Curated annotation (Swiss-Prot):
PANTHER family: 6,7-DIMETHYL-8-RIBITYLLUMAZINE SYNTHASE (PTHR21058:SF0), 6,7-DIMETHYL-8-RIBITYLLUMAZINE SYNTHASE DMRL SYNTHASE LUMAZINE SYNTHASE (PTHR21058). Its EC number is 2.5.1.78. Catalyzes the formation of 6,7-dimethyl-8-ribityllumazine by condensation of 5-amino-6-(D-ribitylamino)uracil with 3,4-dihydroxy-2-butanone 4-phosphate. This is the penultimate step in the biosynthesis of riboflavin. It comes from Buchnera aphidicola subsp. Acyrthosiphon pisum (strain APS) (Acyrthosiphon pisum symbiotic bacterium). InterPro entries: LS (IPR034964), LS/RS (IPR002180), LS/RS_sf (IPR036467). The gene is ribH. This is 6,7-dimethyl-8-ribityllumazine synthase.
Length: 160
């Protein structure tokens, strides 16, 4: 029986982070968590990290598709915050964004991890961006690091 498991060090990897500017004060903390994890735990060199800012979370998939198609990056981390308002608009944004990112990831065989918060209120967003509930940007970075290594090991098994 073959088993593929992997670590979280990926020092020679290139990672793109797409950050929504909408709800920037929360997304800034998610980004800081992701960057800290990539550099400190993953040993990723700063020059191998590309940060791209977009207007909102809904715009992230367009850029993710462009990056994925380039073949230059080992993973993408999506960072954004969607907070429920008075209408169901946030559901459509959240569903469309996550579905699109999942489709792009599968189409290009590229890990795309979600550091996107979908919360009922601003307090929940703050809690998940570095206070009580940890930092979901950091969690997304950890997932990206592990997936990079899993994909590298899987390619060796499949292609060699």
């Amino acid at each position: 029986m073959n088993i593929i498991q992997s670590g979280i060090t990926a020092e020679n990897s290139s990672i793109a982070i797409i950050i929504a500017r909408f709800n920037e004060f929360i997304n800034k903390n998610l980004l800081l968590g992701a960057l800290d994890t990539l550099k400190r735990i993953g040993q990723v060199h700063e020059e191998n990290i590309l940060k791209i800012y977009v207007p909102g979370t809904y715009e992230i998939p367009t850029i993710a598709s462009y990056i994925a198609k380039s073949g230059k990056y080992d993973a993408i981390i999506a960072i954004g915050t969607i907070i429920k308002g008075q209408t169901d608009h946030f559901k459509y944004i959240a569903n469309d964004t996550s579905s699109s990112l999942s489709r792009i990831s599968a189409q290009y065989f590229l890990p795309i991890t979600l550091g996107i918060l979908t919360t009922k209120n601003i307090e929940q967003s703050i809690e998940r961006s570095g206070t009580k509930m940890g930092n979901k940007g950091s969690d997304a970075a950890l997932a990206a690091l592990e997936m990079i290594n899993v994909m590298k090991k899987l390619k060796k098994v499949i292609y060699y």
